[in-house]
């Protein structure tokens, strides 16, 4: 099956609250590969690759806030964006 891609930029209180760690667990749950990393402006960027249904479920889970300590202000979603093909989901430091 074809896999879809998306880049998500998540703003709000999303750094220092376990957001990347819990995002990785959500990615495993929905069989999503890609990366998650903190950006210098305080936001988090996610590169995601998965079958369409799983990618949509992953995005919905991110919008709800995977970490109990986070507060999501906005999730910018760029579907179909070019993303490096990966077999795993990794935290980028």
From Swiss-Prot:
PROSITE patterns referenced in this protein's UniProt entry, alphabetically: ACYLPHOSPHATASE_1, ACYLPHOSPHATASE_3
GO molecular function, one term: acylphosphatase activity
Active-site residues from the entry: 20, 38
Keywords of the record: Hydrolase
Family: Belongs to the acylphosphatase family.
Alphabetized NCBIfam families for the sequence: PRK14443.1
Protein name: Acylphosphatase
Organism whose genome encodes this protein: Listeria welshimeri serovar 6b (strain ATCC 35897 / DSM 20650 / CCUG 15529 / CIP 8149 / NCTC 11857 / SLCC 5334 / V8)
């Amino acid at each position: 099956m074809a896999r879809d891609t998306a880049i998500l930029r998540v703003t709000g209180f999303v750094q220092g609250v376990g957001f990347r760690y819990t995002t990785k667990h959500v990615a495993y749950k929905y069989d999503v590969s890609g990366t998650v990393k903190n950006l210098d402006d305080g936001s988090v960027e996610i590169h995601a690759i998965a079958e369409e249904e799983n990618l949509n479920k992953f995005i919905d889970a991110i919008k709800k806030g995977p970490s109990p300590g986070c507060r999501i202000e906005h999730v910018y979603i760029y579907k179909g964006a070019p993303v490096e093909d990966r077999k795993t989901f990794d935290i980028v430091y």
